[in-house]
Each structure stands twice: as C-alpha cells, then as structure tokens.
Amino acid sequence: NLERATRLVSETGGSILVITEGVFGMRGDQGKLKEIVALKSKYEFRLLVDDAHGFGTLGKTGAGAGEEQGVQNDIDLYFSTFAKSMASIGAFIASDEAVIKYLKYNMRSQIFAKSLPMPIVLGNIKRLELLRTKPELKEKLWSNVTQLQNGLKANGFEIGETNTCVTPVYLKGSVEEATQI
C-alpha cells in the first residue's frame, strides 16, 4: 500500500523502494512497468526491476522489459543475470553511479566478494556485443519461441497469456497424471 508507505516514510525520514519483475518467470507475463512508473511522481519512490527473463529477449536492443514498454529510463535500479539469455554465469545491477557506489561499499555480501573469472567476464562482454550487433540472433530466438508456443497450443496445451519467451505449460489433474505425459 503506497499510501501507508508514504505516511511511514514521512514520519521516519526513510524512502520507498518498489521492487518488481520485468517478466514473471512462472507465468511469462510482463510486469506492469508503465503503470508502476506512472505512480512514481505521486509517491516519490525508487523502482528496482529484476529482469532476469526479459534481459536479452525483450526490447529493440534486448535491454529488457523496460525497453519493451518504453520506460527503461524511468527504472532506478535494473537487475539481471547472464545465466538465462546469455547462457553464462554472473549478474549485474545498473543504476546511477552514486547508488552503485553505495551498494558496493555497504552491502555485506559485496564487501569481501570476489570478481568473476576473467574468461567469464570476457565471454559476457562478447555476448553483450552480439546482442547489440546481431539482431538476427534475437529474431531467431523469437521465431523458435513462436513455433514452440503455437505448437503447444495446436496440440491442446494451455500456455496462458505469455507474451515473452517464458512458456508455461499448465496441466490439469494430479502430479502423477502430469508426469505421465
């Protein structure tokens, strides 16, 4: 409840951080980022988007759900992973320099953390370069996703209203029945 949160921060001197996902990994639907961003000026909050399933797959350049919905520049903290669309390991958070410095020097998990091995870092940089320079790779991904989703529907499977690469398959019946497919 943002009304309640606004009252609390006015009493305590704190601030509000709204956290959501760019793509919800169980259903494949996108977070309502436009609607959330529209509330920022009224409630004065920062927005953190975990876009593990949108990064590399959504938006013109693959920048994710924020780019897809036209609100990427309104996201204050953008978090994603290289483990999904990049088929690698590691993660990143993007924000203003002051926020990144604060996190770097104040998050317990980061104070004594080690960097990723350089071959992994270089591989991730190469993957980012490919994302920017080879749009045909993302086009091929979407061609495959469309074939998969259409094929599942044509064969009577329920996949919900996904508009992303995440393709849930909803099964009716018991767990035993579902495992007998």
Positions of predicted regions on the chain:
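Short beta-strand
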Residues: 16, 79, 113-114, 158-163
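Conserved active-site segment immediately N-terminal to the catalytic lysine
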Residues: 44-45, 64-82, 101, 105
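Short, small-residue-enriched loops and turns at beta-alpha junctions
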Residues: 1, 23-27, 54-57, 110-111, ...
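Conserved PLP-binding catalytic core of the aspartate aminotransferase-like
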Residues: 139-148, 155-181
